[in-house]
């Protein structure tokens, strides 16, 4: 081989090697963050790059409404990112589809497990295997107008007494307002009674505890303390106009509260008829996942681990206004003294992860129909029996698919 040809061969080898090294140091990450969350996450990604010289993290913000479909269509075909961030409600479906999310038990050590609020890691677990690390969570809690409510109610008896005092239908004022026809919101009451959607993987919407919870809701409706049309727009309007003393909602509601409205947050009340147990909302947990087709799995997991550590979680909490799953964050005075962050942490301690099984997608429509008929006086047993029959049929059809 001539010296010239040897030089060309060597240059070619070095070019290939160099390209390989460059690719090995590049990560593509998809997320749906906006505004302050987006800015905080970008800061965390830059910090990761600084900690790993030669590493490049490319972030792509995907509109939330299109995000799930984009993951479903692109990731299994190897056309997606190395890491993506999404809530756990689609986790089971993507795992069953295959080639979408990489299991991470192989990487996960005990110190990393221990950094999280246990139920948030539970939300990342499917059939005993962990598939993501939890970034943050969302739950509904009690939000009250301090001009109308001096001390938030701790029990349902206190809540009803307060709501009766504040309610004046003629003036369009209500003591309590929340989206009680929405099954997601109703779950907090249902869970207080020990209700559930599945037993050992089988749908059980018409179980006795679910019926009791629905009967209890009907009592609140008959008391006249709730608006008849509980749309989110109406609830926001009532609260901002000083016509709702208490609402049940999540962190998304806080951004809709008008300037000048003095509000506070507190735990959802306990329910005497449920044995004094607290209302237990469903929590949705946003996880960071390694895409199964990624050729940079080790680096991708390293990034996922970094963005969920305590330093990153502090940035996401203080600057991004997220409620992190990393429990060490709440030991920091900046977070512990923050009314919003402290209140949601207290609420998540009694919350239940929303089911992440693929069958859950078949629950929403029949459950919503049942809720809409029950709030108009239909027997909860009859309404839930009908919903159960539909969900059982749909689930059976799903499981017959090849």
Predicted regions: what is each one?
Residues 8, 22-98, 110-113, 233, ...:
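Conserved N-terminal structural module of periplasmic/extracytoplasmic solute-binding proteins
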Residues 40-44, 155, 209-216, 286, ...:
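Short amphipathic alpha-helical coupling segments at ligand-binding clamshell hinges
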Residues 81-82, 111-144, 175, 276-280, ...:
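A structural signal for short loop-to-beta-strand junctions that line the ligand-binding cleft
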Residues 82-85, 245-250, 264:
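Paired acidic/hydrophobic, glycine-rich loop segments that form the ligand-binding mouth/hinge
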Residues 88-139, 151, 156-162, 188, ...:
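Hinge/lid segment of periplasmic solute-binding proteins
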Residues 131-135, 140, 158-203, 209, ...:
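Extracytoplasmic/periplasmic solute-binding protein
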Residues 162-163, 201-229:
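Glycine-centered hinge/linker elements that transmit conformational signals in sensory
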Residues 251-264, 269-369, 398-400:
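C-terminal lobe and pocket-closing loops
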